[in-house]
Amino acid sequence: FMGDLKEQAENPEQKVQCGITEVDDCMVVGFKPGTLTLSVADVGGGKSTMMLNISFGLFKKGHNILFLPLEMSFEEIFKKFLCRETLIDFNRFANPAMLTDQDWECLKSHGEVIKKFQQKFLWADVKSRPTVAEIKRAIERKLKYFQPAVIVIDYIANIKPDAGSDNWLAIG
């Protein structure tokens, strides 16, 4: 044990952090490979927004992200990313006719980040209320050509249990 402890002290593991101080401070070891981290809140409690912000933060730190939205379209996710990145009011993305000339210039100036986003932040399309097996297959299809540091599934309540299994056990 002492030898392992000394080795860990001399060669500490790099934590995968998202850049949100409150989250990084709570996640003592960061997002470690092979771990399952659950974020919970009441309906309308901001889980999806929080997971998107964590994912965007991880992406901005150079990590590949695989996002499985079980209730939100990728178009909506991308609009939220653009809003966060450019600080343009989300209502103008929701109604693009409201985007100003200044907004369009801002979007152009963020072209490189947007291009990088499309290469390092992938999503996997899954049907509404997928089973654990269907989610696993969707992830495995992406793993053939993309190696994510973090996989985000938003959100767990929309997962249907495989026939004859308990949902909580299958998810774990």
Positions of PLM-derived features:
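Phosphate-binding loop that captures ATP/GTP phosphates
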Residues: 86-115
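P-loop NTPase motor core
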Residues: 3-76, 84, 123-172
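Metal-dependent catalytic core segments for phosphate chemistry
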Residues: 71, 77-80, 88-94
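Conserved P-loop NTPase mechanochemical-coupling segment
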Residues: 107-130
